[in-house]
Each structure stands twice: as C-alpha cells, then as structure tokens.
Amino acid sequence: MNDNVPGAAPSYCMHNFKAAAAQNAERHEQGKAFVPPKYTFRGFEALPEDPANPDPDKFYGFVFQDTDFSKWIEAVGYSLTHHPDAELEATADAAIDIVCAAQLDNGYLDTYYILNGMDRHFTNLKDHHELYCFGHLVEGAVAYYEATGKRKLLDAACRFADYIDSRFGTEEGRLHGYPGHEIAEMALVKLAAVTGETRYSDLAEYFVWQRGQQPLYFCLLYTSPSPRDLS
C-alpha cells in the first residue's frame, strides 16, 4: 500500500486518497471561493510522466484504483478476526483516517471523480466502476468493523450508500441506472445485515431488478441525442 515494494508497480491508491483529502481540506478552508476541477481526463488509466515524482494533486492508476485499499482492508479484517495484530490494526487505522478524510460532505467517496471532476460522476456507470468501487469499500468496511468493532470506515461506507440511495431509483428525477460491474448488490445486503437498515437491501433489490429493464439504461446513454462522453 505504500508503493515501496521492490520490483512491484506502484498502486498510487493511497496517493490518490491523500490528494483527495488535501483537496477536501482546501474545499473546506475556501468555502464558496473553492473552484472544483472540471472533468477533462481521457482514458482508462493515468500514469505520471516521472513515476518517482507523481504530481501530488493528480489521480493515477486505473479508474477503479480505489479498490486496492478496499480489498486490502477487507483482507486485514479477516486476518485480524483470526490473528489479532496490534501493529497491523494501527496501520489499518492510519489508512482509514486518510481514506475518510477524502470523503465529500455529501458522502461521495471515489477519488477518480473527486480529483478529475465531480461534474461527470455517475455519467459512465458502464465503464468507470463507481458502484463497483463502492461495493468493495462496503465489503472492506463491514469486514473491518466485524473484526475490530471500529465504526469509522463503516460510517463512511454508510454515508456513501445514503448518497447513492438518494440518487438512484425508479422515481422521476433519479438515475435509473445500475452497476456496470456487479458487487454493490451483495455489499449492500451485507451492509443492511450489519446495520439493520433495510433501505440498503432495498437499494440492492432495485439494482438487481432494474438491470435488464427495457429500455436498457446503457443503451439509452449510447443512443441519446446528446450522449455522455464515453471516455
């Protein structure tokens, strides 16, 4: 996770969370004067020109790079359940602090769009893995909570879930979409089980049953008179 493993390609995952956390701090300090980035990125992966000196304000890696943390923290949770390790837990807590500092006030937490431009979030559900990243974050948060009883990451996952729940559904004015890559559905069921909040399982049910409904959501996005940018 620290990008210092000899011979291994850097992940840039924690770099991205730190950059998003710094931007978030700047947003809070400047208030209404803060000018958010506008989405101009083109491509599925971004790498620094000089790997030894990445720009501290930019996103690097694949669009789903956040999941490196999520899968790691899930593994940490399972490990701590069977093999308590104070040092590993402290390392995980420090990483969680960084991740949670990147979360926007509305609950959104995906560094690809936070750093590249929130004006395009939820516009490419098919390819850009936002709900996939969300699902892995939830599964990691649940595993870590069940192992340690610590709620910080779980609460962040709930806030992200609440934001998604406010944006998606069959009602007019909501997005009628669903994940391009499934995992959010079963993650939401786990979140409902651990929190007792049935709205999360209801959201999972919506995603399951909305997929395949005619007209197909992704086809509409590709064929509409003003299709969204697919890059």
Each language-model region and where it sits:
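Well-ordered alpha-helical scaffold segments within catalytic/enzyme domains
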Residues: 73-86, 135-150, 184-197
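Single conserved hydrophobic/aromatic residue that forms the stacking wall/gate
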Residues: 222-231
